[in-house]
């Protein structure tokens, strides 16, 4: 019988460069195995076809993962114009064709039209749930579920390369944006079809692909070297204001009480809390009407002291 490596408490964030061909969950489990971590989760699904930045949260960092899921993101997408696929990407079958002799001017106009605050219908091949099941399970059976359009923001679409029928675009967008659908909508604006042949997430919440690490590189390191690549848990909430509390106020938070706090901040604002010696305590919510802090997500005492 083969003995499995003993799991250990690991706390922090690893910026993974997910390879093509792996689901986000498979990439997560491989990373978790390398670190022998007791608990792990990722922040935002990437399709198996897609590569790039996938922040992996270990241990106490999973408490704050939701704040990164909601962050803006950036992608580099490669489109093939003139062909629609059943999945919106290269993994599906070609189901329709149209003109592919698109001019750069036409493509630029379409990209401009899809920039800004827009509404987007999520694709059937997505992890969104309907009656407890992800939409892609219905799609694989040929069942189409009606989806409501959602408000998203496309901050910028920059054309990195254009040689029809191939186009490469850099997209900066809000959470919940489906690049496959965006590519199809760009083509629809021109009067043709398109599908993705490659997709790479290059940025999320200020983290860039240059900061990430491949599974292969991680496997070639020893445990101490791998651990040195972990970012502290509070990087996930670095965009929130911070405050320092004395030991008594920190104790109050941990006991479910609400220490006094007064700042020029909107009510309900999450605030990063630190001890006087710089340890991250967690997130608290500012209740402006009573000038108090209410605990939202707090680090485990032992992890906070580490």
Curated annotation (Swiss-Prot):
Could you identify this protein by its name? Answer: tRNA pseudouridine synthase B
Q: Which SUPFAM superfamilies match?
A: Pseudouridine synthase, PUA domain-like
Q: Which reaction does it catalyse?
A: uridine(55) in tRNA = pseudouridine(55) in tRNA
Purpose: Responsible for synthesis of pseudouridine from uracil-55 in the psi GC loop of transfer RNAs.
HAMAP family from the xrefs?
TruB_bact
User: Record's Gene3D superfamilies?
Assistant: Pseudouridine synthase (3.30.2350.10), PUA domain (2.30.130.10)
Q: Which UniProt keywords apply?
A: Isomerase, tRNA processing
Query: What family is this protein classified in?
Result: Belongs to the pseudouridine synthase TruB family. Type 1 subfamily.
Native species: Neisseria meningitidis serogroup A / serotype 4A (strain DSM 15465 / Z2491)
Active-site residues, as the UniProt record annotates them: 47
What molecular functions are annotated in GO for this chain? RNA binding; tRNA pseudouridine(55) synthase activity
Domain of life here? Answer: Bacteria
Pfam families referenced in this protein's UniProt entry, alphabetically: TruB-C_2, TruB_C_2, TruB_N
Q: Does the keyword Hydrolase apply?
A: no
Q: Which GO terms describe its biological process?
A: mRNA pseudouridine synthesis; tRNA pseudouridine synthesis
| Enzyme Commission (EC) number | 5.4.99.25
């Amino acid at each position: 019988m083969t003995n499995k490596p003993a799991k250990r408490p690991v706390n922090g964030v690893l910026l993974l460069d997910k390879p093509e061909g792996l689901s986000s969950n498979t990439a997560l489990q491989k990373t978790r195995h390398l670190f022998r971590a007791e608990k792990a989760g990722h922040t935002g699904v990437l399709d198996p076809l897609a590569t790039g930045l996938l922040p992996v949260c270990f241990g106490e960092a999973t408490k704050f993962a939701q704040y990164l899921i909601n962050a803006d993101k950036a992608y580099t997408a490669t489109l093939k114009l003139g062909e629609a696929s059943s999945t919106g990407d290269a993994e599906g079958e070609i189901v329709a064709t149209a003109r592919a002799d698109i001019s750069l001017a036409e493509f630029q106009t379409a990209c401009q039209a899809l920039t800004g605050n827009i509404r987007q219908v999520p694709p059937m091949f997505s992890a969104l749930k309907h009656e407890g099941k992800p939409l892609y399970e219905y799609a694989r059976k040929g069942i189409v579920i009606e989806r409501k359009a959602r408000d998203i923001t496309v901050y910028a679409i920059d054309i990195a390369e254009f040689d029809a029928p191939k186009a490469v675009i850099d997209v900066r967008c809000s959470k919940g944006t489906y690049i496959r659908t965006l590519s199809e909508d760009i083509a629809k604006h021109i009067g043709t079809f398109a599908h993705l042949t490659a997709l790479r997430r290059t940025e999320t919440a200020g983290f860039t692909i240059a900061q990430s690490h491949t599974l292969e590189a991680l496997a070639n390191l020893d445990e101490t070297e791998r651990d040195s690549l972990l970012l502290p848990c509070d990087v996930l909430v670095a965009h929130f204001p911070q405050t320092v509390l004395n030991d008594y106020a920190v104790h109050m938070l941990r006991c479910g009480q609400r220490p006094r706090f007064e700042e020029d901040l909107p009510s309900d604002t999450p605030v990063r809390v630190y001890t006087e010696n710089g340890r991250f305590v967690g997130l608290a919510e500012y209740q402006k009407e009573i000038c108090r802090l209410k605990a939202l997500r707090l680090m485990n005492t032992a992890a906070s002291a580490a």
